[in-house]
């Protein structure tokens, strides 16, 4: 029987999942409508892919977590954990791939450095960005092929994907190998976000020194962008902390509370960043406000009919 604390964690995780599906579903729907109107831009394509991959990732996180909590013995057969591992790699890497592409897009569009290479890349953003997206996709596919080889070799050797009695050191080494592509995308996103924050911070200081005592709209926009980026980095780090906790819990199966905490921490990123994107993107924000206004109007009409 679940304890009160465990019940609270499950409620939080389910709530995060619902918010994540709604938030990312809204982002995907808005951009799909633009696609139907032949207005889908590069950023729209990235946001749509990011939303779809995160919805898929949320379901994998919940499915894997609930299996480990309620029926951990199912994984002993080997086949299910093999499928979950493949789905996890696909969802995780595709989500990271689109998130990295989004970071690079904002970096090339917004950042301002005097470096010759950066200026060359910035002047050719429309050419460089598709190339970078394809490069990231190819690296993701190569990494997935490598992961498939690792899982297949281990299955052939042990007649199961994961031997639940394997040494912890061997298990963690294999997890690092499985997540090499994710670590690469995470590092690249982190670097681009940090450089973008530095660029915005420098530009903000210059504007404040030129216009003493005043904060124009551009300054406010730059401060807002820095807050969004810092929030993104914090959520990104929390996501990896949650992943590390969940991976470690696989070798300590009795500690359900720690596993639930890891699930809760991991699920913060997919739903939290979706709402940050909605609030930070003018098109998505306006669309969300229109939806809220429509809901308020429907509620008022319903109340009038009742009275």
Curated annotation (Swiss-Prot):
Location(s), subcellular: Membrane
Ranges in the topological domain labelled Cytoplasmic: 28-42, 122-126, 201-227, 279-307
Keyword Transmembrane set for record: yes
Segments crossing the lipid bilayer: 7-27, 43-63, 101-121, 127-147, 180-200, 228-248, 258-278
GO cellular component, one term: plasma membrane
Keywords: G-protein coupled receptor, Glycoprotein, Membrane, Receptor, Sensory transduction, Taste, Transducer, Transmembrane, Transmembrane helix
Superkingdom assignment: Eukaryota
Lipid bilayer topology: Multi-pass membrane protein
Family recorded in the similarity comment: Belongs to the G-protein coupled receptor T2R family.
Function: Gustducin-coupled strychnine receptor implicated in the perception of bitter compounds in the oral cavity and the gastrointestinal tract. Signals through PLCB2 and the calcium-regulated cation channel TRPM5.
Protein name from the UniProt record: Taste receptor type 2 member 10
Species assigned in the record: Homo sapiens (Human)
Gene encoding the protein: TAS2R10
